[in-house]
Amino acid sequence: HESEAPITRTVVTPISPPTDLHLEPSPDFATLTVSWSRSPSPGITGYRINTALLLGIRLHSGYTLEEEVTESQSRVCIFDNLSPGVEYNVSVVSVKDDQESEPIWKTITQEVPSLTDLNFVDVTDTSIDLRWTPLKGPTIIGYRVTVVAAGESVPIYEDKVGPTQGYYKVSGLEPGIDYDISVITLVTDGESAPTTLTTADCCPTATDLRFTNVGPDSMLVTWSAPPSMVLSSFLVRYVPSKNEEDAAELTISPSDNMVVLTNLLPGTEYIVSVFAVYEERESTPLTGVQRTGLDSPTGLDFSDTTSSSFTVYWMAPRATVTGYKIQYHPETGGAGQKEERCVPPSRNSLTLTNLTPGTEYVVSIFAVNGRQESVPLVGQQATVSDTPTNLEVTSSTPTSMSISWDAPPVGVRYYRITYTETGGETPVQEFTVPGDRSDAPIRGLKPGAEYIITVYAVTGRGDSPASSKPVTVTHKTVVDKPTQLQVTDVQDHSIQVRWMPSSTPVTGYRVTSVPKSGVGPTVSHVVPPDQTEMTIEGLEPTVEYVVSVYAQGKNGETEPLVETAVTNIDRPKGLAFTEVDVDSLKLVWESPKGQVTTYKVTYSNPEDGIHELVPAPNGDEDTAQLHGLRPGAEYTVSVVALHDDMESQPLIGTQVTAIPPPTNLLFSQITPTSVTVSWRPPNVQLTGYRVRVHPKEKAGPMKEINLSPDSTSAVVTGLMVATKYEVSVYALKDSLTSRPAQGIVTTQENVSPPRRRRITDVTETTVTITWRTKTETITGFHIDAIPAGGQNPIQRTISPDLRTYVITGLQPGTDYKIHIYTLNDNARSSPVTIDATTAVDSPSNLRFLTTTSNSLLFSWQPPRSKLTGYIIKYEKPGGPVREVVPRPHPGATESQQSQNLEPGTEYTIYIIAVRSNYKSGPLVGKKRTDELPRLVTLAQPGQQGRILDVPSLVENTPFISQTSFDNGNGIQLPGTSGQQNIGHQGQQVFLEEHGFRSPVLPTTATPVKPGYQAPEQHTLDKYTPGQHVPTIREDIELARFPPRQIDMDRPTSHDSGPQQVDRTGQEAQTTISWRPLLETTEYIITCHPVGNEETPQQFTVPGTSSSATLNGLTRGATYNIIVEALKGKNKHKSRELVTVTSAAHGSGVLHGLEDTCYDITTGSSYSIGQEWERMSESGFKLWCRCLGLGSGHFKCDSSKWCHDSGLNYRVGEKWDRSGENGQMMSCTCLGMEWKGEFKCEPHEATCYDDGKMYVGEQWQKEYLGAICSCTCYGGQQGWRCDNCRRPGAGVTPSADGVVGQTLSHFSQRYQQNANFNLKCPIECYLPL
């Protein structure tokens, strides 16, 4: 049979699930432990545990926790962080590879945890504080606090707090009520069981019970009241612990926390309780136990006292005792020898033996109960003494002494006495005296030796004597003392004494001094035995001292020899000067020791002598004020203390008064970087000034300038723009510095100067200028036009809109420096400068004075310009233009033309003023020459015949060869020949002339025919007309000689000569005559002025003359006139005479004014020859003399003074000045012989090097890499350097190659030869 194929099916049986699923939450419900039993299926590889949140009847997949474990691991799984109060489905399946069994599952709800450590931390009558530890968990949302009164069910208080809070204060409670307080943990869907506490008391209990001051029948009980509760009272109950029937209680005020319990039983234990009472309720008691102390025995008594024993009695205390303890010890020094005895409670007495005789004992009795002791009962008792007392030395000599003592209260057989020298150098001596004696002598001792004497009282039987405690005394035998103590000298701090020496040998003397009043230190000194005199120092003034002198031996000293003395008054100390002012001083001093009644203060200086201050300072003062002193003067001040008739030594000091500061501090010429400071100098002799300038409101460098004493201004440069500066000016005198004159100045803003300035037009009195500016704020322009001489500058401030300006009011033919500034409020720019020269103005007022047939004499008014000459041209109609040669000098105002002029011809005259390369427009005039003259014969006075004289030609007139001219102002002065350099450092000699003075014509000498008499007028005058060219004519007497006319335009005849007819009478007319000599070709007339500085005048007349009229000499001047006849080359003196000139006369001549001079500067009039002083406008001091000249003319010059830096110095006066390089120079005024010059030499005490000043000191400077030492010698010696050392080298460099010698290159002594310079500007004024 064939079988069918089997049908096969594979069936896998399901895996069995685990069994015995068990869920175990932790006590705090924080974790869940899941456990199970293994699946019975084989091959299980592991288990999967799933915990899912169950919401309603469904699982919430979003809240699932899953864990897997292998078969080899324990079948336990722990889940944490489960939310309390939530229901979870926990399932477990068996896993075999990829197969899973059916799950086994259970549901569980995690309990909400309750608080476990809730407690009270503070309980008061109305509040309770709660504290707990917050639980951790994401579902805990907080805590609810519930308060329920005890016995009630409805809460009276409920509140919620956050999940992290662990503290809560329950307030608003009523005192005396019990409360149940619960705290419940809240979660999202539930809450925990409540944790409840109940307040057990109606009110809090007192604390800190203490017992102090416990005695046998009392004790002090203290406690601490409960906080934050107002109680009604405290109740204190106390009762013996063994007898509760004797309980007692006390009610205490609630404000008290202590009570004293009294009337207690000694040695008894008490139970003490303290209750806090609120209304009628009591708190839990605060209880303690304390035993009272034992009471002490009483009635202490002593009896049966001997030298070595006594008996003690007492009475028993109330408390029960177990015995007594008795302690005793000597009162003095016996605490360490304390003895102790104990007796039973039945005893009440005790005999103490073996005590020390004559000793006070302290006895203490204690009641004892077990270990407890009472306060001791204390008493004192002394044993009987057997020792002598009060041992003393009753008398002593150098070799013996007597002693005595008091006997003891016991029987004494005899006394044993010993004595020996201190130090143990001699053996002990001993003797006895009977027991009924209480004194004894000791002999055979050494003088001045110290002995120890001891006395013993001997008691007892003779075979066993008992010696008492000894009594001892020390004594020194006396030494022979000195005699005749005398006080020989007394000072304020010392006393000198002398004495006669001791008759016995001594080792020295001790001298002491003690204030008799007892107040003050004792001074003691020891001197050798051969000295019998001493000065005691260090004493107080005006104190009475007791002076003692002791003679000293080897073993001691004698009784003192005593004398008293009073020390003198002490002098003041510590003189100091405060508040030093210009004319006053305040002085202070330290008051002397001792008594002072008053002080005498004197002060002196060489100029004023000695003065005493009145009223004198009192004795309690220590200051004084001196007034009326000289500024900058050194004073010697003396202060003397006075007391009764005593006077101290003087306290002396010196002090220099202050110098006054400069005043009237002014600031000018303020620019952005500089300022000019000026001041008024003080009225004292100074050595210099110091100017300090420092910024006021911001940081910057400080400037300091040292100036000479003649300075009154300083220019400070290098300042910061628009900066406020504080300026201080100090006056210096040697080492003294005055208080500063101070001021505040602000530099200006930086303003841009004008640009592109130029001159567009120039006339005689105007200059037109133009300029440009930057585009910035401008408030105006300032223009200064300063002439070359510096006089009368023109200043103008104009509108900011102008860029062209015409400067008017200028002087013709003058060089000007024109400065243009840009203005901005108070600030101005630096100047731009233009040099300009005004045009030369033309001469004016042409006048023809004299005409002849071949010459014209004319004059003109000179222009205001300073000229260098004139050009004079002339022409006739149809003829060429000719020029007068030589050209007239700048001071000329007239000219005579006689070359090739044609008679009866009209000439045109051109006068052109010349200044260097500049020419003025011409002054033009026309004049006709005279026709040829006719020969006229006139009758001569006193002569019968007719004589014909021919006038001499002008061409034959000799000229003075040397002429000198003025400074260009049209006035010619003698002796001012310009600047001369004679090698002196100096100044300008300043000359002035005042008063109208007509241009002077040449002096004319006129020969006079016989028979003509000319009167003389003599007028004193210093004026010298010698600068002009004199012309000489013979006086031809014509019958019809026309009178002189003032009309200058009217022509005069040839006979009148070249006379100027408008002079005012200052020229003189003098006629002289002489005896004619044969063969004389001409006569030379020389006029020598007597007593003044005029230049001698010389004239010539023809040899046929025997007399001449001299015109043009100074009126009133004295001349020595010499007439010499010239024969070929030989001269023969014809006549010599001295005469005083007189004024010219004749009709039509104007006579001079009154001969006085009026000076408008001084406002005074002066007679002819009178002299006076005045100041020039430029600061020179002048010496003036009235000349008159008929016009009030006077002449001034500065030759009697030296002028320097605005100050004037007389001849011989010296002063200091600062040189151009800053060095100090010493100057001396030389005076008239040097024409106002002064000589300056290096200052005798100062040296200058590299801009620094040194005064008698040394400094170092570098030369060729070496350091040289320089020394200032001053004056002509200067300074020199030597001792040059090169650092690190041993060779000293030298300019001449010689090692160690003074460097010749560096031995500068700046021996500047005295430089003398003479500048003589002349200023002349011509009043209209």
Swiss-Prot record:
Keywords: Acute phase, Cell adhesion, Cell shape, Disulfide bond, Glycoprotein, Heparin-binding, Repeat. PROSITE patterns: EGF_1, FN1_1, FN1_2, FN3. Residues 930-1064 are annotated as: Connecting strand 3 (CS-3) (V region). GO terms for molecular function: heparin binding. Residues 1155-1199, 1200-1243, 1245-1287 form the Fibronectin type-I domain. PANTHER family: FIBRONECTIN TYPE-III DOMAIN-CONTAINING PROTEIN (PTHR46708:SF2), TENASCIN (PTHR46708). Fibronectins bind cell surfaces and various compounds including collagen, fibrin, heparin, DNA, and actin. Fibronectins are involved in cell adhesion, cell motility, opsonization, wound healing, and maintenance of cell shape. May be involved in osteoblast compaction. This is Fibronectin. It comes from Pleurodeles waltl.
